[in-house]
């Protein structure tokens, strides 16, 4: 489709999710419909402005190879083959170049751009209003399912966009087929309980504080001393402290939308500020997912990272 290499596209997509609706968002919908649809291709933001972890991409041999040879590969796939096949088959290279090459590329471009623009401009928001992302059925038709964008922004690691069985999400069905053919692995699917909880809380407009939201469904949580929490984290256990609670994120590290690096830096620390806007202002859905990983409550409420830094500076 000639929309950038895997590495380029994934980096911009991750930046969009991390900085959504802010000045660092590459497709910032708050700058207007034109900017989010086409303007960003003209007034491009350089990748150096972002703090986005792409170490997994840089260590993937397929991604590295495709990025290195992206231009000849894209020219061959987007123009070479569409021109050559009609030329060899029925002597119509002009029709192949125009319809299968140029026209197809224009349609594909605007179908994808519609997700950045119209799916942030018009539609329903069944999961959250914290971002401009919306579920737009028309965009879903055009972009083969990508229009269920409110769900995608709330649950960015889920391979689905249309979560209901009757949602028109061709991308989801193709990915499932690829899994059956063993061409796709490690598909992540958010549990129905977490999705229903997010939808229910949003409908009831109960934006509970982190401690209440996280502990409501867990009954008695065993206490732990701050030093013991730090010791366990330093010994290799994936523990993160947020608002006086400790979460075991060991099985979530490789699925963290912001990348492994930023989550690992939070281990053994008070990550309250990071979770609530310092690193990324996480959604209600993220809070619900986090609540399933609760393992301890810190005795006395824990440490505040800012005060901890001041103590170290004074020593």
Which residues are covered by each model-predicted region?
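Interhelical loop and helix-boundary elements at the membrane-water interface
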Residues: 61-70, 121-134
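Conserved, well-structured core segments
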Residues: 139-140, 240-242
């Amino acid at each position: 489709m000639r929309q950038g290499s895997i590495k380029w596209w994934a980096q911009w997509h991750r930046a969009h999710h991390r900085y959504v609706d802010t000045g660092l968002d590459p497709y910032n919908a708050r700058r207007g419909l034109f900017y989010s649809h086409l303007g960003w291709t003209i007034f491009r933001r350089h990748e150096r402005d972002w703090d986005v972890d792409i170490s997994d991409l840089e260590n993937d041999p397929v991604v590295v190879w495709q990025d290195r040879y992206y231009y000849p590969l894209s020219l061959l796939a987007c123009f070479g083959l569409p021109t050559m096949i009609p030329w060899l088959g029925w002597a119509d290279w002009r029709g192949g170049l125009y319809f299968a090459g140029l026209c197809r590329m224009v349609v594909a471009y605007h179908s994808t751009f519609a997700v950045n623009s119209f799916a942030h401009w018009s539609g329903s928001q069944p999961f959250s209003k914290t971002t401009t992302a919306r579920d737009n059925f028309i965009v879903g038709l055009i972009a083969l399912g990508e229009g269920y964008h409110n769900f995608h922004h709330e649950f960015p690691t889920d391979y689905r966009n249309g979560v209901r069985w009757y949602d028109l999400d061709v991308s989801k069905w193709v990915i499932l087929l690829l899994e059956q053919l063993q061409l796709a692995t490690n598909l992540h699917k958010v549990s129905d309980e977490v999705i229903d909880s997010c939808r229910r809380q949003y409908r009831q407009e109960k934006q509970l504080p982190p401690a209440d939201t996280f502990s409501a469904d867990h009954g008695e949580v065993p206490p732990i001393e701050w030093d013991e929490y730090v010791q366990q984290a330093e010994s290799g256990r994936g523990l993160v402290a947020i608002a006086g609670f400790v979460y075991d994120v060991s099985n979530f590290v490789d699925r963290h939308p912001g990348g492994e690096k930023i989550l690992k830096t939070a281990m053994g620390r008070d990550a309250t500020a990071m979770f609530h806007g310092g690193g990324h202002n996480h959604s209600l859905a993220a809070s619900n997912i986090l609540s399933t990983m609760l393992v301890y409550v810190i005795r006395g409420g824990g440490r505040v990272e800012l005060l901890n830094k001041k103590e170290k500076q004074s020593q």
